[in-house]
Amino acid sequence: LNKTLLIRGMGGLTEILCEMASLLKFKVVVQTSEQEKERYPSAAKIITNELDLEDIDFHVDYFILATHHRNDDRISLEALKKGIPYVGVVASAKKTGIILDYLKMNGVTEKELEHFYAPTGLELNAKTPEQIALSILSEMVMLANGGSGKQKKSIIS
């Protein structure tokens, strides 16, 4: 793949996402706090300053927002306006509704919303950070490869 994945967040899920995405040959860039940077040895690059998305000077194919902050709506808007093809937010259904309302109120078009994935990931009934990361990365690979997300046994004719 060698597509660039920018993960903005910290903690266990961000750590697992970084590690698993690296195994899948994504070029992983993590934006996190200075105190957290040692947690991401498999990242190609770590950004520790409060860089706005509009100031990022490299191409981003996938963006995962795993911060659970009140700024998730603004950051999602920035990512969509920047034209990032996959903007995924780790969020509850309630939080997703709030973000979607914000995006629509701020002029995000239906076409732009096609690139917004929240809650991000496939429905695996994931319970652990590892399972959540698998769900998210499975969705990204499915979209990149034009997969259906169906069980293989259900598509054998």
Tell what function each PLM region has.
Residues 48-105, 126, 133, 141:
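Phosphate-bearing ligand-interacting subdomains
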Residues 28, 63, 87, 113-116:
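Hydrophobic/aromatic residues located in beta-strands of well-ordered beta-sheets
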Residues 4-6, 83, 116, 128:
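Short, flexible coil/turn micro-motifs enriched in small/turn-prone residues
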Residues 1-58, 66, 74, 100:
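Hydrophobic, well-ordered beta-alpha structural blocks that scaffold small-molecule cofactor pockets
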Residues 7-10, 86-89, 119:
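Short glycine/serine/threonine-biased micro-segments
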Residues 26, 84, 108:
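Short phosphate-binding/catalytic loops that engage adenosine nucleotides
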Residues 90-157:
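Adenosine-phosphate binding glycine-rich loop
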